[in-house]
Amino acid sequence: VGSEMCIRDRTSDAAYEERATLFGRSLHRDARTDAQLLQEALTVAQKADVIVAALGESSEMSGESSSRTSLDIPDVQRTLLKELLKTGKPVVLVLFTGRPLTLEWEQAHVPAILNVWFGGSEAAYAIGDVLFGAINPSGKLTMTFPKNVGQIPLYYAHKNTGRPLHEGKWFEKFRSNYLDVDNEPLYPFGYGLSYTTFNYGDITLDRTSMPMDGSLTAKVILTNTGSRDGAEVVQLYIRDKVAESTRPVKELKGFQKVFLKAGESREITFKITPDLLKYYNYELQYVAEPGAFDLMIGTDSQHVKTATFVLH
């Protein structure tokens, strides 16, 4: 927004370019009111087959000394988005942001959301490639997106609680939960969609007991179950179940980006060594301690397959 960059032409039709370029090749600040700009946008949207709504934060809203008390998109933008959806035309939300936002309303009402952060001078070309289907996206989130600002801090590698909520439960009295929202994020760490789908088989381990000077191999079958070729980021997480110091419920220990043709399956392998299990203890010694570990492989930090092994 406000850039001289335009999405590259998908046709050499000069008439198409004249129709598509409604306000010149760049946008500038002016004195029009929000109501005037809203009406102008709706007038243009009525002529479109598909609406691409570029909304979110400006770059000045992120970074040092740029805190916010709300993580919703600005009110005037949500008003515009609601009006665009009322047209009945397909709407794609292209989201510019420098931080996780609360997008529960958008998730429930907008058919497609493309999070683009703050791209550089070539970002428009990449966005255009994804929107037009020239590229099958395979990116994954490096931050957790909450449902509500009240859930913050919210991150995947948190410590366990002494009163955990039972799996599958939304609320239990005197457990670690909220009265008005469940504990889960809107989009977990490592989340990301594609124009195809992938299926993970169960994890197999070549051994379930590993000595301090040994290793083990974890394998999983990954299948592209969709109709398009695509890439998947296979993520490896490990949990130290009992340690001298409290350990996170899971930690990212590795990942592989795997390209599969439609219908193709492949065996994905991770080598596990004691070095992957080490942490700094109270004496600041970098150690791996004997005990049980959960090994998780999946598409993001919440949707994983699990196997258990013992280090001795």
Predicted regions span which residues?
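Secreted, periplasmic, or luminal enzymes acting at the cell surface/secretory milieu
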Residues: 3, 12-29, 96-231, 237, ...
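Terminal connector regions
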Residues: 273-312
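Intrinsically disordered, low-complexity Pro/Gly/Ser/Thr-rich segments with frequent PxxP/GP/PP motifs
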Residues: 244-280
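Hydrophobic helix-and-loop "lid/oligomerization" segment in the mid-to-C-terminal part
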Residues: 12-108
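Short acidic, flexible loop segments centered on an aromatic residue
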Residues: 227-244, 250-252
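Short, small-residue-biased leader/transition segments that mark boundaries at the very start
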Residues: 1-7
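Intrinsic-disorder/low-complexity, polar/charged segments enriched in Ser/Thr/Lys/Arg/Asp/Glu/Gln
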Residues: 215-217, 265-269, 304-306
